[in-house]
From Swiss-Prot:
<dbReference type="InterPro" id="IPR000649">
    <property type="entry name" value="IF-2B-related"/>
</dbReference>
<feature type="site" description="Transition state stabilizer">
    <location>
        <position position="164"/>
    </location>
</feature>
<dbReference type="Pfam" id="PF01008">
    <property type="entry name" value="IF-2B"/>
</dbReference>
<keyword id="KW-0614">Plasmid</keyword>
<comment type="similarity">
    <text>Belongs to the eIF-2B alpha/beta/delta subunits family. MtnA subfamily.</text>
</comment>
<feature type="binding site">
    <location>
        <position position="90"/>
    </location>
    <ligand>
        <name>substrate</name>
    </ligand>
</feature>
<feature type="binding site">
    <location>
        <begin position="53"/>
        <end position="55"/>
    </location>
    <ligand>
        <name>substrate</name>
    </ligand>
</feature>
<protein>
    <recommendedName>
        <fullName>Methylthioribose-1-phosphate isomerase</fullName>
        <ecNumber>5.3.1.23</ecNumber>
    </recommendedName>
</protein>
<keyword id="KW-0486">Methionine biosynthesis</keyword>
<keyword id="KW-0413">Isomerase</keyword>
<comment type="pathway">
    <text>Amino-acid biosynthesis; L-methionine biosynthesis via salvage pathway; L-methionine from S-methyl-5-thio-alpha-D-ribose 1-phosphate: step 1/6.</text>
</comment>
<dbReference type="InterPro" id="IPR042529">
    <property type="entry name" value="IF_2B-like_C"/>
</dbReference>
<comment type="function">
    <text>Catalyzes the interconversion of methylthioribose-1-phosphate (MTR-1-P) into methylthioribulose-1-phosphate (MTRu-1-P).</text>
</comment>
<dbReference type="GO" id="GO:0019509">
    <property type="term" value="P:L-methionine salvage from methylthioadenosine"/>
</dbReference>
<feature type="binding site">
    <location>
        <begin position="254"/>
        <end position="255"/>
    </location>
    <ligand>
        <name>substrate</name>
    </ligand>
</feature>
<dbReference type="InterPro" id="IPR005251">
    <property type="entry name" value="IF-M1Pi"/>
</dbReference>
<dbReference type="InterPro" id="IPR037171">
    <property type="entry name" value="NagB/RpiA_transferase-like"/>
</dbReference>
Length: 364
């Protein structure tokens, strides 16, 4: 997407053909910083400490991590060790495991001498595939926005609520939940996006609001608990969120707080859609609440908040009493029964085993 006069991806291969650059998202929206990842340790740190985040982008970053590893040691033992090291960084996002499996399955049959070049080629293919998947998701989600817009008065916006950041910053480009929004704007459909702040890391306030501003999308930042109120008063036409893991029966694991938005949407008759590329579907899991591991992140993310101080510096301040413990589950699971549809690159599926297999018959 464009930032100022430049088109950015969130991750790209450097001219040396070996290191990769990323947008370090910890500093947004106040500072756009680019960081170079040169080692597997760099990649693991970037994923674990959320320099990059969002299930698709985590997967792409891990794929490049495997490629970097192959330049140092292309052996089977090292390939397996790197798979384990990177897989442990963020356990909930299924794209991470998918990308690592894709890399290992591609490289294992190859002679060691050719693995490094092949690894970079495959990682780049995964990155390019992500862009195409998101573009297709956008086209399919745009149909939903068009349908709502057709019922509006001329110039009246489609009001969309989104949670966390499932934008281009969570992918290589376009985003999942935001791709239909960007395409609607490009088509001239009036929209207004309500952006949940998304505590505790404020990815809505820091990232989604920044994306909307950069792209010129009308939006309003709201506190996490305001969504239900807006729905009660008829101010939301549509909810679109992303997902870090979707089960074979249509349950969705997404940023903590998504479940509450789905409950409010169901109670108020607001359509609730989830946008996802197919690598986010875990076909081995059939009960999201019971089977998906939920990442527990450090309590300091709840107790402290980062922002720009009055002197212009970026500062972290404590907002809770010293000694008060904080729990920080990073995700929750929204049952399929609360979801209107799953927007994929192949179309919109009903959130059920039958609905998903209708779009992905190879999984029957």
């Amino acid at each position: 997407m464009k930032v100022g006069d430049r088109h950015y991806h969130t991750i790209w291969l450097n001219e040396d053909g070996r290191s990769v650059d990323i947008i370090d998202q910890r500093w947004l929206p106040h500072d756009l910083r680019v960081v170079t990842l040169k080692t597997v340790a760099d990649v693991a740190l970037a994923i674990r400490d959320m320099w990059v985040r969002g299930a698709p982008l985590i997967g792409v970053t891990a794929a490049y991590g495997v490629a970097i590893a192959m330049t140092k040691d292309p052996s089977d033992a090292h390939l397996d060790a790197v798979w384990d090291e990177l897989h442990q960084t963020r356990p909930t996002a299924i794209n991470l495991r998918w990308a690592l499996d894709a890399m290992r399955d591609h490289l294992r049959p190859l002679p060691e001498a050719g693995r490094a070049d092949a690894a970079y080629q495959r990682a780049t293919e995964i990155a390019e595939e992500d862009i195409e998947l998101n573009r297709a998701i956008g086209a399919n989600g745009l149909k939903v926005i068009r349908q709502i817009a057709a019922k509006k008065k001329p110039g009246e916006p489609v009001r969309i609520l989104t949670h966390c950041n499932a934008g281009w910053l969570a992918t290589v480009d376009y985003g999942t939940a935001t791709a239909p929004i960007y395409m609607a704007v490009e088509e001239g459909i009036p929209v207004h996006v309500y952006v949940d702040e998304t505590r505790p890391r404020n990815q809505g306030a820091y990232l989604t609001a920044w994306e909307m501003s950069s792209h010129g999308v009308p939006h309003t930042l709201i506190v996490d608990n305001a969504g239900g109120h807006l729905m009660q008063h008829g101010d939301v036409d549509l909810v679109i969120v992303g997902t870090d893991r979707t089960t074979a029966n249509g349950d969705v694991c997404n940023k903590i707080g998504t479940y509450l938005k789905a409950l409010a949407a169901r109670d108020n008759g607001v359509p609730f859609y989830v946008a996802l590329p197919s690598p986010t579907i875990d076909w081995t899991v059939h009960d999201g609440v019971k089977e998906i591991p939920i990442e527990e992140r450090p309590g300091d993310e709840v107790s402290f908040v980062q922002g720009r101080a009055s002197d212009g510096s970026i500062a972290s301040v404590r907002i809770s009493p010293e000694g008060s413990p904080a729990a920080n589950p990073a995700f929750d699971v929204t049952p399929a029964r609360l979801i209107t549809g799953l927007i994929t690159e192949r179309g919109i599926a009903t959130p059920s085993p039958e609905g998903l297999k209708a779009l992905f018959p190879e999984r029957r």
